[in-house]
Amino acid sequence: MKKFLLVAVLALMATVSVMAKTDGQTYEPVNDLKIVNVWIQDRFHTPDVFPKKDYCHTRARTAVLSNGVVYIARSEVKEAITTAGDTVAQAVIYRLDAATGEELAPLDVTLNGEPYGAFLGVNSIGADNFGHIWIGAYSSEKSAENPFYQLNTETGELTLIATLNKGDNISRIDYFDVMGDITREQAECNIMAPGSQTANVYRWHADQGSDTFEGGFEGDICLVMTSFYPETVTEWSYAPYARMCLGSSEDDMYMGELFYVDGFNSAPALYDVTGSLIDSFEAVESSLHPEAGTNGVAEFNIDGRNFIVYSRAQYAGTGRGCQANICELGEGMSLGGMTKYWQIPADSLGQTSDGGNRVHSFNVEYSQENGSDVVTLLTFKCFNGIGVYKIGKNVSGGGEEPQPLTGDVNGDGVVNVSDVTSLVNKILGDPTYSDTVCDVNADGVVNVSDVTTLVNLILV
């Protein structure tokens, strides 16, 4: 009986450890700012947990952090029957507590009271500047319009915000960005999306209080860009991503007059609404250049300093996979003068192909901790992993880091023969597992004596 209770307690501890897992990295403070990982779920740190999650899927492409909750949108999850008797593949929004990583009840997505099952119907999810969650559906190069919705975060019901017309220059749209208020009650609303495999950028604008969206480029819906970085690029290629920047005054706060576009074969570049290239990675040292094939960028401000976070490389990068750089922008918020602070995670989220979805989601929330400003940063890479980080002068992690189970080399929460295999691979040169978990006998080195200790643990 005692042995059964001990096993049950250990199993419970292992479960808690997995749920509260951090990346285990120590990030050095830079210019009085610290960063800590609150929690992480990914193929690298929780390889036997994250791949089993319903939101680890190639149709779960984007995520957003809003009001302390992480929302992950997955299209075409499960069969549902409409009142007309039709079968559709219903979309689901998965929710996690941003403070702990604990799963909250998912939202089955509906439209007009019916299961919502449009093809890639929740391809793009985000939050406006007033906490409203929006959903942008995928649309092909043959579709002249794109539906855009608000999500009810209690029920999963969608409300149509606008049917966005692409005008005469039609191209495929994968991902959107929003600045302002999608309800137009508290501010204007601007919606942007670059066109896939084109040089198109679409923009729609509605004044505060207006029911109508119109072209956001001085009345035009689409602007064809002519300047890129690198200069050899002539279009965005696959699944590009746009991100508008907050203005510097009350009058222009939500105009989104400056915006980044990050394409498959280009680095993030900053434009204005005339199409002029304002800034790029041209003057950035080469070691900080992102690799081709991954799209994602965001800005934030803390302690009077301006930062950029961008996708460094995707699963096939020369690094360890799906990481992001966090850099302080240079004088005048220039890219060329930026200073790297950290790479997150320092090791990896994962190195598994997501089928070419390209997008890497980032966004932030602001709060205070221990009397100082704090930025909470979400990083999400489809089919590879998700993590929440905090940045500030006095930040601390998401509670005390659970102590690893001695002998649990592969981090799956149990000690068995699979850990022996992992340990032997480590000794033979596999860098996947840390020295800390592999030093089973705690003598300061990892060698064959640790294998003996581990085998004895299993046989006890």
PLM features: residue spans?
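Beta-propeller blade signature
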Residues: 88-101, 145-156, 201-208, 322-330
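Short glycine/acidic-enriched loop and turn motifs that connect beta-strands
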Residues: 76-84, 139-144, 195-199, 264-267, ...
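Blade-loop segments of beta-propeller domains
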Residues: 88-131
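Conserved beta-propeller blade signature
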Residues: 69-72, 132-134, 187-193, 254-261, ...
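Beta-propeller fold detector
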Residues: 24-48, 103-112, 158-167, 211-229, ...
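Loop/turn-rich, solvent-exposed surfaces of beta-rich toroidal or solenoidal domains
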Residues: 281-348
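Signature of short aromatic-glycine-proline-rich micro-motifs recurring in repeat-based ectodomains
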Residues: 48-66, 113-126, 135-139, 166-193, ...
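Cellulosome-associated attachment modules in secreted, modular CAZymes
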Residues: 395-460
